[in-house]
Amino acid sequence: MSNEVDRMDVDEDESQNIAQSSNQSAPVETKKKRFEIKKWTAVAFWSWDIAVDNCAICRNHIMEPCIECQPKAMTDTDNECVAAWGVCNHAFHLHCINKWIKTRDACPLDNQPWQLARCGR
């Protein structure tokens, strides 16, 4: 066994561990840890369960204010721009879809009759 250790390309510490473990019944582990994790910050990604995350009417992200609410968004923080989901699972800003419904009672994306499923954030 010692001849094999002499011929192998190993570090000094590893060859001593091999020689010690051949003399003992249980292997002795004296290696230091390569690194230790002291703090772990987990990151998660998520998305809404909707077909489109932009309002197809005003082209803004559904969680940002619509073009009607943008001018007053900085000054009036009490009013929220609420999203509206249809039964077709398409989401629009409530202001945008209300204007759309006045001219045409269908979803702007799939042309199905518009039915409100839920409203809110």
Swiss-Prot record:
It is found in: Cytoplasm; Nucleus. Component of multiple cullin-RING ligases (CRLs) composed of 4 subunits: the RING protein HRT1, a cullin, a linker protein, and one of many alternative substrate receptors. Component of SCF E3 ubiquitin ligase complexes containing the cullin CDC53, the linker protein SKP1/CBF3D, and substrate receptors containing F-box motifs like DAS1 or GRR1. Component of RTT101(MMS1) E3 ubiquitin ligase complexes containing the cullin RTT101, the linker protein MMS1, and substrate receptors belonging to a protein family described as DCAF (DDB1- and CUL4-associated factor) like MMS22. A zinc finger (RING-type) spans 55-111. Core component of multiple cullin-RING-based E3 ubiquitin-protein ligase complexes (CRLs), which mediate the ubiquitination of target proteins. Recruits the E2 ubiquitin-conjugating enzyme CDC34/UBC3 to the complex and brings it into close proximity to the substrate. Also stimulates CDC34/UBC3 autoubiquitination and promotes the neddylation of CDC53 and RTT101. Component of the SCF(CDC4) ubiquitin ligase required for ubiquitination of the cyclin-dependent kinase inhibitor SIC1 and for the G1-to-S phase transition. This is RING-box protein HRT1. Its main location: cytoplasm. The keyword Cell wall biogenesis/degradation does not apply. InterPro entries: RING-box_E3_Ubiquitin_Ligase, Znf_RING, Znf_RING/FYVE/PHD, Znf_RING_H2. GO terms for biological process: cell division; cellular response to methylmercury; G1/S transition of mitotic cell cycle; G2/M transition of mitotic cell cycle; heterochromatin formation; mitochondrial fusion; mitotic intra-S DNA damage checkpoint signaling; nucleosome assembly. It comes from Saccharomyces cerevisiae (strain ATCC 204508 / S288c).
